[in-house]
């Protein structure tokens, strides 16, 4: 019993996809350009008129899973350049009000648990961080960079050495779009 491995991804109007010789896929859309090398032995990515086809030469379990992974990466790249990704986070505190300030490279978190020294969270490559009161909005076109920026912010406010059931201060994810 041989299963059909090929995954077909439709390319929406206004999006251009280029596939290089070294399996580098470049997706350009209204919001910008995302480029990524999607190489795996035995996996082939080819472009038809208005779609991308991800196929494998071998029908083993590892290759089936890599076809799905590659197709998911391509879908995320297409969604990123058309709609973008947005994560909303909320600063939660009980006594000491957290003060947030975003620069181009980092988010400064002051007065966290009453600490005198400000904590900082690194903002990754193509992500933008906007602070509105206690809400932090992370946006961008690369899902992995936006997600890593969100994780950096959450990890910067992790409470260590105290009972996390009591000390629930921090900046937490509340919405993904």
Regions found by a protein language model. Name each.
Residues 1-177:
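Ribosome-associated RNA-binding proteins
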